[in-house]
Swiss-Prot record:
Transmembrane region(s): 235-255
InterPro entries tied to this protein: CLMP, Ig-like_dom, Ig-like_dom_sf, Ig-like_fold, Ig_sub, Ig_sub2, Ig_V-set
Skewed-composition ranges (Polar residues): 364-373
Protein name: CXADR-like membrane protein
Tissues in which the protein is found: Predominantly expressed in epithelial cells within different tissues and in the white adipose tissue. Expressed at high levels in the heart and brain, at intermediate levels in the lung, skeletal muscle, kidney and testis and at low levels in the liver and spleen.
Annotated source species: Mus musculus
Example GO BP: digestive tract development
Primary role: May be involved in the cell-cell adhesion. May play a role in adipocyte differentiation and development of obesity. Is required for normal small intestine development.
Pfam family, one: Ig_3
Signal peptide: 1-17
Lineage: Eukaryota, Metazoa, Chordata, Craniata, Vertebrata
Keywords, ordered alphabetically: Cell junction, Cell membrane, Disulfide bond, Glycoprotein, Immunoglobulin domain, Membrane, Repeat, Signal, Tight junction, Transmembrane, Transmembrane helix
Extent of Basic and acidic residues compositional bias: 263-280
Disulfide bonds: C34-C110, C152-C207
Length: 373
């Protein structure tokens, strides 16, 4: 009775197997153990199967051995990365995964069956991810007497991630600890507040982010500035900008002045004064040789003179200015005015000729002058 009880207990333990938990870092290699003694009697009926239940409860087959064939490309996520680690026919059906990925995390089950006997084991695999390289930032103005916040954070990595700030020694005698007036935000360990900055607070600070898989770090430099020096720099920059604007304005005024002088010089010969005297007409006494020809053209000259009111008025003044002597015939004068270039001859209408004939008939002195000539 006692022997049967011991055999039953041993069979029960062999059937249920064991539960094992393994932690590995991503991109590394892992071997999940599974041992049995069911393949020795009959190898043809041996069946081995590895199953994965992920964190969401979904189950899938990883690798199997059946009918003397191995099937290890059953899932697209683990294709080419899973295999039996040793001689599974001799009793070592351990599973090897390389390289590890975060999606490989979950509960693995090894089932071995042969001739009605079976055994299985369970392995819980946790894939750890190293923290990504953190990003160090400064919040605030690094001026003397003010407060400055150092910010450090990793974008990815297995939780929890621990942050640690320290000062890097650049010179002999510098302290590696944070300044005395520094406070760590325990709700967010990646933030450190540096209060009441002094020139001694300047230096290089390093933040380290770490977890079970590893650690990464970043550095940032703090340069504390005097408030007076900032004012002087701002004043100097303002003065330089103002000076540059003034020089530009002077150059612009000079160019504008030269352009204006050049324009005045070009337009000066074409100016017309309003108080300038009009060109004077002069009277020319015709010679005896040309009197006949002028007499023949008297009609047309009279016609043209009547067409121009200004010429007619000047001729009348000339006639009055030259008094006639008794017994002598009046002399004919021709009005010579300033030469007009580029002027076209005016057209004389029929009505103008009619008016001219009427004027000639009503002017006795002018008619007598033409008759005498």
């Amino acid at each position: 009775m006692s022997l049967f009880f011991l055999w039953l207990v041993s069979y029960y333990v062999g059937t249920l197997g064991t539960h094992t938990e393994i932690k590995r870092v991503a991109e590394e290699k892992v071997t999940l153990p599974c041992h049995h003694q069911l393949g020795l009697p009959e190898k043809d009926t041996l069946d081995i199967e590895w199953l994965l239940t992920d964190n969401e409860g979904n189950q899938k087959v990883v690798i199997t051995y059946s009918s003397r064939h191995v099937y290890n490309n059953l899932t697209e996520e683990q294709k080419g990365r899973v295999a039996f680690a040793s001689n599974f026919l001799a009793g070592d059906a351990s599973l090897q995964i390389e390289p590890l990925k975060p999606s490989d995390e979950g509960r693995y089950t090894c089932k071995v069956k042969n001739s009605g006997r079976y055994v299985w084991s369970h392995v819980i695999l946790k894939v750890l991810v190293r923290p990504s390289k953190p990003k160090c930032e400064l919040e605030g103005e690094p001026t003397e007497g003010s407060d400055l916040t150092l910010q450090c954070e990793s974008a990815s990595g297995t939780k929890p991630i621990v942050y640690y700030w320290q000062r890097i020694r650049e010179k002999e005698g510098e302290d590696e600890h944070l300044p005395p007036k520094s406070r760590i935000d325990y709700n967010n360990p990646g933030r450190v507040l540096l209060q009441n900055l002094t020139m001694a607070s300047s230096g290089l600070y390093q933040c380290t982010a770490g977890n079970e898989a590893g650690k990464e770090s970043c550095v940032v430099r703090v340069t504390v500035q005097y408030v007076q020096s900032i004012g002087m720099v701002a004043g100097a920059v303002t003065g330089i900008v103002a000076g540059a604007l003034l020089i530009f304005l002077l150059i612009w005024l000079l160019i504008r002045r030269k352009s204006k002088d050049r324009y005045e010089e070009e337009d000066r010969p074409n100016e017309i004064r309003e108080d300038a005297e009009a060109p004077r007409a002069r009277l020319v006494k015709p010679s005896s040789s040309s009197s006949g020809s002028r007499s023949s053209r008297s009609g047309s000259s009279s016609t043209r003179s009547t067409g121009n009111s200004a010429s007619r008025s000047q001729r009348t003044l000339s006639s009055e200015a030259a008094p006639q002597q008794p017994g002598l015939a009046p002399q004919a004068y021709s009005l010579i005015g300033p030469e007009v270039r580029g002027s076209e001859p005016k057209k004389v209408h029929h009505t103008t000729l009619t008016k001219a004939e009427t004027t000639l008939s009503t002017t006795p002195s002018q008619s007598k002058a033409f008759q005498t000539v």
